[in-house]
Amino acid sequence: MTRSGGPRVSTPGRLFIGLMSGTSLDGADGVLVRLAAGQAPQVLATAGLPMPDALRAELLALNRSGADELHRAALAAQALARVYADAVQALLQQARQPATAVTAIGVHGQTVRHRPELGYTLQLNAPALLAELTGIDVVADFRSRDVAAGGQGAPLVPPFHAAMFAAPHERAVLNLGGIANLTLLVPGQPPRGFDTGPANVLLDTWCRRHTGQPYDDNGRWAATGQVQAALLEHLLADEPWLALPPPKSTGRDLFDAAWLDQRLQSYDGPAPAPQDVQATLQRFTARTVADALEAAAPATRDVLVCGGGARNQGLKAELAMCLQRPVQATDAAGVPAQWVEAMAFAWLAQAFLDRTPAGVPQVTGARGPRVLGALYPA
């Protein structure tokens, strides 16, 4: 690829790339979009690359303390940057665009620690290497500036959701990644948003353990089981984080295989079959979302869903039942559900270059709006 060169003038119709690998660790998503003031983003290319098995295993391991983890984290960050660079190459080839046409890449990295209450969040990333490999300016490290201002550093996508999905009525946007998070859109008010609890992170973990498959396709395995009401209430009652008021955020630091195993071990009912646990976890995700929405925005009229979980028809059916509102993918509003989060990081890169604050205090609890990100020139 050709280097992108020196400073650019802020002009309408700039091209940005957004890259995202989420808590579920199923792969890296990339999107090439044209962003122009007053216009809907124009998607020029998309790419979804699977996460190499060895890298996925190492990233999972790095969510917990272990031997020589600083060295291992540095190597994993470099390997991840090479996956991202492959995604960039695929996008440019698909769109038949040179690297010089792209203003910047916005890349999230891979969260391995998120402890805003201790003043830090850590995303494994090698943005300098990504800039070197692609020849394109890279904007990264979007969360730490908000955390430095006393915020949660998450979720980051509500201002993008507000720009894309605002309606004349109260609406919610639900991102179903590894963790579920809600954006609440009320006409005439800044967006609010917060994490509601686990989504794919527990569903995928349990499915992989018992079926060998990376995820429960359309909730088919869950459909063979029965929701265990007593186990569901045990899961809901046994986690203090769920009762915390917003702003709040979470991740694999809390909701992981160890969390689930501990709850199953402390459950005093009959041992449930694996498929019954899967059905119960699916209902658990839907209930935590519904309970959070009812507490924070009971006048919400409809819910748009994005993220990997938007493809799970079984989970969407559970959500519709628990939410008692219309639930549909963001595709219905013109933005493909699979690419919303990657698009958000392209949008956040643009906001950084324009020095537009993208941190929303009503979402994160920060002391004020902040410009998010750091620049790594090509």
From Swiss-Prot:
Pathway: Amino-sugar metabolism; 1,6-anhydro-N-acetylmuramate degradation; Cell wall biogenesis; peptidoglycan recycling. One of its GO terms (molecular function) is kinase activity. SUPFAM superfamilies: Actin-like ATPase domain. One of its GO terms (biological process) is peptidoglycan turnover. It comes from the Bacteria. It catalyses: 1,6-anhydro-N-acetyl-beta-muramate + ATP + H2O = N-acetyl-D-muramate 6-phosphate + ADP + H(+). Its EC number is 2.7.1.170. InterPro entries: Anhydro_N_Ac-Mur_kinase, ATPase_NBD. Keywords: ATP-binding, Carbohydrate metabolism, Kinase, Nucleotide-binding, Transferase. ATP binds at residues 22-29. Coiled coil: none annotated. Catalyzes the specific phosphorylation of 1,6-anhydro-N-acetylmuramic acid (anhMurNAc) with the simultaneous cleavage of the 1,6-anhydro ring, generating MurNAc-6-P. Is required for the utilization of anhMurNAc either imported from the medium or derived from its own cell wall murein, and thus plays a role in cell wall recycling. Belongs to the anhydro-N-acetylmuramic acid kinase family. This is Anhydro-N-acetylmuramic acid kinase. It comes from Bordetella petrii (strain ATCC BAA-461 / DSM 12804 / CCUG 43448). The lineage of its organism: Bacteria, Pseudomonadati, Pseudomonadota, Betaproteobacteria, Burkholderiales. The gene is anmK.
